[in-house]
Amino acid sequence: MASNPYTRTTMEGHTVAGNAFYATIKLSVTASQTSYYSLSIPAGVQDVCVFMSREMVTSSNGAWLISHYPNAVVDTTGTPFPVFNANPQSAKQTQLQISPVTVSVAGQPVDEVYLPASGRRIGGNYPQGSIRVQSEGSLVVGAKSITAGGSADLYITYTWIQVPNIQDL
């Protein structure tokens, strides 16, 4: 595995009304490397349980993706714990509404976001409430190409709201 190609320079998180969380993260990324990383949940938001592990993949042409998976989250003590349970019978299963989402590389919005479960592809910036992701799904964010060996800053700003009733979806 290559050395980490990024430096996390900013992370700010806040709770809203006890059931929502939003954060702004800045990553300084060097392309043409592959790395795995996860983000810690700030104190006081463990109950929301919505941060997911990230896998950064660099392809041969210098483009890269950040994929979100429902596992391998670390809390403030560094202990991994599950975020989603894909068992429909699980009382812990939730719907997440992500709103708003703005992703940019070097100040430019990403090309699109792909939701594998539905096959939807949407632009890189979203009005509030425009994206729904079921707990058994993943969210894949595709960034603009970065020339191999180049670098750019990645900004992600997002809000997660926990909705207990997924049965109605």
What are the roles of these predicted feature ranges?
Residues 2-169:
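Beta-strand-centric surfaces of beta-sandwich/beta-rich domains
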